[in-house]
């Protein structure tokens, strides 16, 4: 990656100031001591990766931040050494198994809450991967592995990312589904969550914003295999074209600073038994757009058609390599 202009580089002092101001604007807690530990432990990842802000529309929810890593690193081991994560956490073996796939090539990134520290470990698998590979690693409990048939039955056969939530002991599995997404397929995927079907205008808005071949994240309880939530994403939505969002998200998108050459705003519509909410992410430093482009993510206004996915789906393959 070429050197960034100084105003686009990650600066720890500026980040602390921006973190406090953004958290105050949305009513989120900050724990400076934990923030300092995070920034020191992962100083190279923040310096060389892309950093972004995250939050949800839920009142009082955390202001979170993530680095998308350009470095191949055991972020879990580093977090354990720094006291940010318990090395005996039962989810650690799952991350280890996923990280060992495909010759050990998956790249780990990490999410942190401003008030609590380590939140998630996030893995990019290097492209389209068979869901069977991801959901059959030995560390995954049998009830989670048993969910594979439910996803394949909906045509969700390929995964690009996964994340573990350390506090909730859950995992998000990010599928790329062949679209275009319509109301019938939306309803089938939504039904996995057991939530109340959303209003027709909400569904219409989701369908209008997701790319043709869409990204849906499915949240699984890592003990029971229960599906807690489903979330549909729209990436790099311009400010002047953003969908209706709750007031807390609108405030977040207005006040969270971005020093990237191109702003990258992400909207996620999350549905589940416990209620629905909106997620938002916003680029900060390190050129988030560049990283997501390199990972073949689709942005608002693009065709959003994955020709490799379509070739795999058309042949009925669930064992294709990375694309």
Curated annotation (Swiss-Prot):
Organism: Streptomyces niveus
GO terms of biological process kind: novobiocin biosynthetic process
One GO cellular component term: cytoplasm
Taxonomic path: Bacteria, Bacillati, Actinomycetota, Actinomycetes, Kitasatosporales
EC category: transferase
Listed CDD domains: PT-CloQ_NphB (cd13931)
Function summary: Magnesium-independent aromatic prenyltransferase that catalyzes the irreversible transfer of a dimethylallyl group to 4-hydroxyphenylpyruvate to produce the ring A structure in the novobiocin biosynthesis pathway. Novobiocin is an aminocoumarin family antibiotic that targets bacterial DNA gyrases. It is able to prenylate many different compounds, including the phenylpropanoids 4-coumarate and caffeate, the plant polyketide resveratrol, the (iso)flavonoid naringenin, apigenin, daidzein and genistein, and the dihydroxynaphthalenes 1,6-DHN and 2,7-DHN.
SUPFAM superfamilies assigned to the protein according to its UniProt record, in alphabetical order: Prenyltransferase-like
Endpoints of the signal sequence: none
Subunit structure comment from the entry: Monomer.
Entry similarity comment: Belongs to the aromatic prenyltransferase family.
Protein name: 4-hydroxyphenylpyruvate 3-dimethylallyltransferase
Reactions accelerated catalytically: 3-(4-hydroxyphenyl)pyruvate + dimethylallyl diphosphate = 3-dimethylallyl-4-hydroxyphenylpyruvate + diphosphate
Thermal dependence summary for this entry: Optimum temperature is between 30 and 40 degrees Celsius.
């Amino acid at each position: 990656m070429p050197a960034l202009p100084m105003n686009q580089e990650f600066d720890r002092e500026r980040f602390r100031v921006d973190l406090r101001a953004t958290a105050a604007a949305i009513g989120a807690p900050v724990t400076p001591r934990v923030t300092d530990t995070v920034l020191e432990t992962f100083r190279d990842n923040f310096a060389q990766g892309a950093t972004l802000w995250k939050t949800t529309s839920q009142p009082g929810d955390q202001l979170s931040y993530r680095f998308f890593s350009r470095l191949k690193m055991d972020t879990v081991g580093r977090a354990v050494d720094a006291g940010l994560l318990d090395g005996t956490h039962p989810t650690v073996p799952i991350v280890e198994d996923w990280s060992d796939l495909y010759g050990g090539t998956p790249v780990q990134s990490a999410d942190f809450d401003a008030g609590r520290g380590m939140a998630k470990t996030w893995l990019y698998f290097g492209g389209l991967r068979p869901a069977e590979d991801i959901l059959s690693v030995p560390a995954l409990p049998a009830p989670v592995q048993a969910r594979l048939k439910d996803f394949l039955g909906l045509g969700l056969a390929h995964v690009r990312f996964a994340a573990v939530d350390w506090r909730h002991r859950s995992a998000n599995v990010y599928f790329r589904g062949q679209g275009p997404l319509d109301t019938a397929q939306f309803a089938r995927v939504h039904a996995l969550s057991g939530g109340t079907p959303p209003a027709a205008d909400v569904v219409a808005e989701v369908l209008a914003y997701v790319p043709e071949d869409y990204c849906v994240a499915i949240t699984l309880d890592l003990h029971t295999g229960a599906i807690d939530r489903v979330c549909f994403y729209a990436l790099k939505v311009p400010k002047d074209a953003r969908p209706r969002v709750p007031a807390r998200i609108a405030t977040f998108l207005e006040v969270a600073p971005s020093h990237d050459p191109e702003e990258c705003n992400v909207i996620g519509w999350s549905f589940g038994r416990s209620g629905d909410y909106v997620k938002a992410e916003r680029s900060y430093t390190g050129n988030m757009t560049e990283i997501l482009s390199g990972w073949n993510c689709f942005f608002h206004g693009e065709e959003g058609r994955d020709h490799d996915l379509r070739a795999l789906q058309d042949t009925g393959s669930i064992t294709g390599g990375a694309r």
